[in-house]
Amino acid sequence: QSFDKALRHFSDISIEYMVADLDVRTAVYSKGYDAVCAFVNSVIDADVLKILYDNGIRLVLMRCAGFNNVDVNEADRLGITVMRVPGYSPEAVAELAMGLALATQRRIHKAYIKVRENNFSLHGLTGVTLHGKTAGIVGTGKIGAAMCRICRGFGMKVIAYDKYHNESLDFVEYVELDRLLSESDLISLHCPLDDTTYHLIDERTIEMMKNGVILVNTSRGAIVNTDALIKGIRDMKF
């Protein structure tokens, strides 16, 4: 609907919608079009790009900030331009991240299930106070910076890890990743997925965390090793 609304101002552009994600099986349907628009679950590797190129596609539009699912080197070699949305509603994502943290920390989801089943026992619903605790933010781009400001509003000490320091966050202390993992009561991930962040959270890094730590990931799922996460849950780390 948002696309259709925007199209009212561009009479020379038409859009056709497909339910299926873009991959090697569906790329053939691009014939006759000038561009394709994809999302986070699309697989735009070298094989897909070759099909797109042969069909006359010279523009790939990603309606998301991340582009880890696009072989940008192959796209560049073929002369296909790849564009993305560098930032959209960073506060909304950061608020969701804090909402998830609060649901965990205050056992809101458990309380909801109990009340729905007419169980008003308070057993197992005791939470902890975030005020005065340490929030560790991994990645301080637009979303991570918004999360830093939210955590500050809760009266938390905010530390962060990022290759590039955000100069606007003068209240944030940048530290090495190992220190962040070991000192934080809340760890929130806001980094892109690439070769350096794939399984950034694994068995070794989980072992470094405090017992009872709150871990929130609103970035790409592959930043966290799922098997290691399950083991950490079973070991009562979280």
Language-model segment annotations:
Residues 38, 135-137:
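Hydrophobic Val/Ile/Leu positions in short beta-strands of Rossmann-like dinucleotide-binding domains
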Residues 78-134, 146-149, 153, 161:
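Phosphate-binding beta-alpha-beta segment of Rossmann-like dinucleotide-binding domains, i.e.
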Residues 54-59, 78-80, 156, 211-213, ...:
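A short helix->loop->beta-strand "cap" motif at the edges of active sites that frequently abuts
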Residues 140-141:
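Glycine-rich Rossmann-fold phosphate-binding loop(s) that bind the pyrophosphate
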Residues 1-81, 202:
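An N-terminal-biased, well-structured beta-alpha scaffold segment characteristic
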Residues 163-238:
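Rossmann-like adenosine-cofactor binding region
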Residues 53, 148, 152, 233:
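Gly/Ala-rich phosphate-binding loop of Rossmann-like dinucleotide-binding domains
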